[in-house]
Amino acid sequence: MTKIKLKTKSSVKKRFHLTAKGKVISTQSGKRHGMVKRSKSNIRNQRGTTILNKSDSRIVKLYMPYGI
């Protein structure tokens, strides 16, 4: 009899990635709308990715049982 495999949450699959050491990477938040109010340097700093802190990454890893 085969074991039931856990499913990965598809919303987490789209938004987060794991590094080789197990850290969780996501894109910077706050870039959808309202850019007129922000300074150019703030907009530039929000490009790219960021590493989640321990408490948030623990929650995200629960939804990615096999890592992606």
From Swiss-Prot:
Q: What is this protein called?
A: Large ribosomal subunit protein bL35
Indicate the family of this protein.
Belongs to the bacterial ribosomal protein bL35 family.
Give the InterPro entries listed for this entry. Ribosomal_bL35 (IPR001706), Ribosomal_bL35-like (IPR021137), Ribosomal_bL35_CS (IPR018265), Ribosomal_bL35_sf (IPR037229)
Question: What keywords appear on the UniProt entry?
Answer: Ribonucleoprotein, Ribosomal protein
Q: GO: which molecular function terms?
A: structural constituent of ribosome
Q: Which organism is it from?
A: Wolbachia pipientis subsp. Culex pipiens (strain wPip)
Q: Where are the transmembrane segments?
A: none
Which Pfam families is this protein grouped with?
A: Ribosomal_L35p
**Could you tell me the superkingdom of the organism this chain comes from?**
Bacteria
The gene for this chain is rpmI
Keyword Ribosomal protein included in the entry's annotation: yes
SUPFAM superfamilies in alphabetical order: L35p-like (SSF143034)
GO cellular component, alphabetical, reads: cytosolic large ribosomal subunit
The GO annotation for biological process reads:
translation
